[in-house]
Curated annotation (Swiss-Prot):
Source superkingdom: Eukaryota
Principal subcellular localization: cytoplasm
Spans traversing the lipid bilayer: none
Annotated positions binding Zn(2+): 126, 129, 149, 155
Gene: TRIM54
InterPro entries assigned to the protein according to its UniProt record, in alphabetical order: COS_domain (IPR017903), TRIM/RBCC (IPR050143), Trim54_Bbox2_Zfn (IPR033492), TRIM54_RING-HC (IPR042752), Znf-RING_euk (IPR027370), Znf_B-box (IPR000315), Znf_RING (IPR001841), Znf_RING/FYVE/PHD (IPR013083)
Organism, as annotated: Pongo abelii (Sumatran orangutan)
MF annotations from Gene Ontology: zinc ion binding
Alphabetically ordered keywords of this record: Coiled coil, Cytoplasm, Cytoskeleton, Developmental protein, Differentiation, Metal-binding, Microtubule, Zinc, Zinc-finger
Function: May bind and stabilize microtubules during myotubes formation.
Cellular compartment(s): Cytoplasm, Cytoskeleton; Cytoplasm, Myofibril, Sarcomere, Z line
Stated name of the protein: Tripartite motif-containing protein 54
Length: 358
């Protein structure tokens, strides 16, 4: 079967061509896919150059010195669904090419080069001059308008520019902002993942220290149980304080990521608006929001070693050795025998507070 002939019914009118073109837009450069086109494991497509750009933004340390290509390995997230893409030693060049999409692009370009008599471009009309199309952009008032408004109307003293020029400029500006947000979101996600690992390390270290405390206190007599409980409570408090702080940071980063992702989605939807004037009516606000979101400064991450719980290590060997010297004392009263362990407990507490003691 000839693929071109079988595909032509989908390209029969302007509406179908517009719908098809939307499916052939790269989510990174916001232009039609450029060859080679690679397909990700999540089945989304990217220009290989754009995939390389996203990978380098997410993995700056993997970039070869003095080169713009990545030699091997690494990972990044799909800008469409956030699925993590793990690369082999060939980097983005190890991703499979989507020859079907490349063929569709070739067919689309061939068909779109032919005149479509049924295709009639729609224009927004000027509210002041109902028979005039909106065809210029007022730089002073930052609104689309018509030629009569410039000659006779409210914008006669304003500076204007052709509508396509401002359309391309602001679309490029918004595209750059979206690319920065996508790269920033990958970095935020990496920070969240690192802090989740910090939480796990804190829990693991706390669990290990509790086990160590239990093992050491099992060799002591009952008079040390109260001290053991106090140390466990201190450890639990520190663990909870650290976990609360890190989880609070995770929530903050997560909220920022959610807000940023929603803004990216809104901006991408705006980029799909085919009408230049309608697009420009809302582009400025989106550009400002994207710029403001890109400049948001998040709280700092926990300092190195924050997950360590080594300060709760307890040395009881010298205390156990001292307790092993306790023996019957001929002639001692039962009251003295009961008081003696309390004195030992006090000595043990003093020894624990002096890490340099014998």
């Amino acid at each position: 079967m000839n693929f071109t002939v079988g595909f032509k019914p989908l390209l029969g009118d302007a509406h179908s061509m517009d719908n098809l073109e939307k499916q052939l837009i790269c989510p990174i450069c916001l232009e039609m896919f450029s060859k080679p086109v690679v397909i990700l494991p999540c089945q989304h497509n990217l220009c290989r150059k754009c995939a390389n750009d996203v990978f380098q933004a997410s993995n700056p340390l993997w970039q070869s010195r003095g080169s713009t290509t990545v030699s091997s390995g690494g990972r990044f997230r799909c800008p469409s669904c956030r699925h993590e893409v793990v690369l082999d030693r060939h980097g983005v060049y190890g991703l499979q090419r989507n020859l079907l999409v490349e063929n569709i692009i070739d067919i689309y370009k061939q068909e779109s080069s032919r005149p479509l008599h049924s295709k009639a471009e729609q224009h927004l009309m000027c509210e002041e001059h109902e028979e005039e199309k909106i065809n210029i952009y007022c730089l002073s008032c930052e609104v689309p308008t018509c030629s009569l408004c410039k000659v006779f109307g409210a914008h006669k003293d304003c500076e204007v520019a052709p509508l396509p020029t401002i359309y391309k400029r602001q679309k490029s500006e918004l595209s750059d902002g979206i690319a920065m947000l996508v790269a920033g979101n990958d970095r935020v996600q990496a920070v969240i993942t690192q802090m989740e690992e910090v939480c796990q390390t804190i829990e693991d270290n706390s669990r290990r220290q509790k086990q160590l405390l239990n093992q050491r206190f099992e060799s002591l007599c009952a008079v040390l149980e109260e001290r053991k409980g106090e140390l466990l409570q201190a450890l639990a408090r520190e663990q909870e304080e650290k976990l609360q702080r890190v989880r609070g940071l995770i929530r903050q980063y997560g909220d920022h990521l959610e807000a940023s992702s929603k803004l990216v989605e809104t901006a991408i939807q705006s980029m799909e608006e085919p009408q230049m004037a309608l697009y420009l009516q809302q582009a400025k606000e989106l550009i400002n929001k994207v710029g403001a979101m890109s400049k948001v400064e998040l709280a700092g991450r926990p300092e190195p070693g924050y997950e360590s719980m080594e300060q709760f290590t307890v040395s009881v060997e010298h205390v156990a050795e001292m307790l092993r010297t306790i023996d019957f004392q001929p002639g001692a009263s039962g009251e003295e025998e009961e008081v003696a362990p309390d004195g030992d407990e006090g000595s043990a507490g003093q020894e624990e507070e002096r890490p340099d003691g014998p």
